[in-house]
Design a protein with these regions (language model features):
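Extracellular/periplasmic metallocenter environments
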Residues: 35-72
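Surface-exposed loop/turn positions
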Residues: 8-10, 20, 39, 51
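Short, surface-exposed beta-strand/strand-loop-strand elements in extracellular ectodomains
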Residues: 23-30
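Short proline/glycine-enriched turn/loop motifs at strand-loop junctions of beta-rich domains
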Residues: 16-22
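Short linear motifs in intrinsically disordered
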Residues: 11-15, 42-45
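Beta-strand-rich interaction surfaces with strong enrichment in secreted/lumenal proteins
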Residues: 2-4, 30-34
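N-terminal edge beta-strand
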Residues: 1-11
């Protein structure tokens, strides 16, 4: 699982690619993106909530990243 850190007040920018089609969900921010099979999806979200949040494959609850938003 990847561990990523962003500063509050900036942007959370993450690219997710996959061989299979999945819905990827970022908890805490409650945003999701569909990743097509063999493709990728881009997350770009204002980093306005501080804390540690899990990004996961929604249907299987498999975590793919831990997103930390720290004071800027």
């Amino acid at each position: 699982m990847r561990e990523l850190e962003f500063e509050s007040g900036g942007e959370i920018e993450v690219s997710v690619s996959s061989d299979a089609a999945y819905e990827i969900h970022l908890h805490g921010y409650d945003v999701s993106e569909d990743v097509p099979a063999g493709g990728s999806a881009e997350f770009s979200v204002p980093a306005d909530i501080e804390g540690v949040f899990e990004m996961e494959i929604e249907d299987t609850a498999v975590p793919i990243a831990e997103i930390s938003v720290v004071p800027g």
